[in-house]
From Swiss-Prot:
<feature type="transmembrane region" description="Helical">
    <location>
        <begin position="153"/>
        <end position="173"/>
    </location>
</feature>
<keyword id="KW-0604">Photosystem II</keyword>
<keyword id="KW-0597">Phosphoprotein</keyword>
<keyword id="KW-0479">Metal-binding</keyword>
<feature type="binding site">
    <location>
        <position position="166"/>
    </location>
    <ligand>
        <name>chlorophyll b 4</name>
    </ligand>
</feature>
<feature type="binding site">
    <location>
        <position position="105"/>
    </location>
    <ligand>
        <name>chlorophyll b 2</name>
    </ligand>
</feature>
<comment type="function">
    <text>The light-harvesting complex (LHC) functions as a light receptor, it captures and delivers excitation energy to photosystems with which it is closely associated.</text>
</comment>
<feature type="binding site" description="axial binding residue">
    <location>
        <position position="59"/>
    </location>
    <ligand>
        <name>chlorophyll b 1</name>
    </ligand>
</feature>
<keyword id="KW-0148">Chlorophyll</keyword>
<keyword id="KW-0793">Thylakoid</keyword>
<keyword id="KW-0812">Transmembrane</keyword>
<feature type="binding site">
    <location>
        <position position="81"/>
    </location>
    <ligand>
        <name>chlorophyll a 1</name>
    </ligand>
</feature>
<dbReference type="Pfam" id="PF00504">
    <property type="entry name" value="Chloroa_b-bind"/>
</dbReference>
<feature type="modified residue" description="Phosphothreonine">
    <location>
        <position position="38"/>
    </location>
</feature>
<keyword id="KW-0603">Photosystem I</keyword>
<dbReference type="InterPro" id="IPR022796">
    <property type="entry name" value="Chloroa_b-bind"/>
</dbReference>
<dbReference type="GO" id="GO:0009523">
    <property type="term" value="C:photosystem II"/>
</dbReference>
Amino acid sequence: MAAATMALSSSSFAGKAVKLSPSSSEITGNGKVTMRKTVTKAKPLSSGSPWYGPDRVKYLGPFSGESPSYLTGEFPGDYGWDTAGLSADPETFAKNRELEVIHCRWAMLGALGCVFPELLARNGVKFGEAVWFKAGSQIFSEGGLDYLGNPSLVHAQSILAIWACQVVLMGAVEGYRVAGGPLGEVVDPLYPGGSFDPLGLAEDPEAFAELKVKHIKNGRLAMFSMFGFFVQAIVTGKGPLENLADHLADPVNNNAWSYATNFVPGK
């Protein structure tokens, strides 16, 4: 029998029956019981969501014009803009979408890592070097570089040691995500959930859909922020918070335009 209805005759459960669904249990001919995991189908999003569907928010609002036919508003962050036609091919679009989401996450972590040590240093926490693009040079100092300032964790005086640690730390997480977790239970490697969602933020489908939009929007801002940090480091040789403090102290002489004019030929 593929499914069975078992009447429980104990005194505490008299008169009650438990039905084992074929999707959750099977009784084979040799008496073994096999269990299968059932996946609950997500509820469809409400048609009133401003971020999805044909009536979603567009990149120029009411002046956006008609979106390309392949941008249907199915995915978060789709504002109907693809001038270069990068999303026309479904396979290319899927690949680029994954690349964007992953780069968004690294950029958000990177932007936090660029600002937070400098913020702590300005509030009395001692660092060997708090400015993000100067921190790596500590491996060439006499004392080397200690992870988290603790010499008992990783004491590095070699670029290869730093590289190896990054490969292990970053590669392990990415490998875990792409492989679908330790048991291969992850359905969507872009939004794996499970161990990656300990707070259960993805349990409600509508709230999760909105979080995806916030996630991609903040990630795009973070990528622009990282680009700005790179340019600031090259032009001013200072960290982002120091540049901000200089601008607030003297906005007339410390701004993008004043630095750009320094590169005018003949000046």
